[in-house]
Regions:
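Generic hydrophobic, amphipathic alpha-helix propensity
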Residues: 20-29, 45, 70-74, 78, ...
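N-terminal intrinsically disordered/low-complexity leader segments
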Residues: 1-19, 30
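Amphipathic alpha-helical packing segments from all-alpha helical-bundle domains
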Residues: 79-80, 112-122, 129-156, 166, ...
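Amphipathic, non-transmembrane alpha-helical scaffold segments
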Residues: 17, 21, 71, 75, ...
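Short alpha-helical scaffolding segments that buttress acidic/His motifs in well-ordered protein cores
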Residues: 107, 121, 125, 168-175
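Hydrophobic/aromatic-rich alpha-helical bundle segments in the mid-to-C-terminal region
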Residues: 135-139, 154-204
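Hydrophobic alpha-helical connector segments
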Residues: 69, 80-115, 168, 193
Length: 205
């Protein structure tokens, strides 16, 4: 069953209303990528989306609710795209090198080659440092993402799949963040893929 989408007054939205709300969230994400979370407000999103301040307030009510919606959108994208490769990850579990290669391919295709997604993901996580209202939704999605690959990590040989997933996740995140700031030529072949393979073998020692 699809989750019903509502506005700030808890009124269920029509399909058209839900689409308009999505457009406003996308506008907020563009601001986050371009200027950082601190630049997001009901007014700046209204300007970015060529909408009225009242319309943004109708859908979200507060900046906090708007930011939560932005986090939900980014994290949902990661869950959907990552979930699609879980069968490949589980199938590769008997071979750590192949397991690493699946993770590399996913991150290259969905994060490195889509820098706006990667930057938005990092920015909303950083926003959680200063904005406590975002922490519950970040925690919720973190558990969702970890649960998706728990079986694959166990099949790989991990004795503590949640901890090992977190270790690999944040290490990969750091590698990609470094590439975003200081791009390297042949990043995937000469740096990223070998590093991820070492990460995977390290959790099996």
């Amino acid at each position: 069953m699809n989750k019903k989408i509502k506005n700030a007054a808890n009124i269920e939205l029509t399909h058209r209303g839900a689409q308009r709300r999505d457009d406003l969230v996308k506008a907020a994400l563009r601001i986050i990528v371009r200027e950082g979370p601190g630049a997001v407000s009901l007014r700046t999103v209204a300007k970015e989306a060529a909408a009225s301040h009242g319309l943004v307030a109708y859908y979200f009510g507060t900046r906090s609710a708007l930011m939560v919606a932005a986090v939900e959108t980014v994290c949902s994208y990661i869950a959907t795209t990552f979930g699609a490769i879980i069968p490949d990850l589980e199938a590769a579990a008997p071979d750590p090198s192949k397991f690493a290669a699946v993770l590399v391919r996913y991150n290259i295709d969905h994060v490195v080659h889509h820098p706006d997604i990667g930057l938005a993901l990092y920015e909303v996580n950083l926003a959680g440092i200063r904005e406590p209202d975002l922490r519950p939704v970040l925690l919720k999605w973190g558990k969702v993402h970890a649960a998706l690959c728990r079986k694959a990590f166990i099949a790989l040989g991990s004795k503590e799949p949640e901890k090992d997933y977190a270790f690999v996740l944040y290490a990969i995140g750091g590698l990609i963040l470094g590439q975003s700031a200081l791009p390297r030529r042949k990043f995937e072949a000469e740096f990223f893929a070998p590093a991820v393979e070492r990460l995977i073998y390290s959790i099996l020692r």
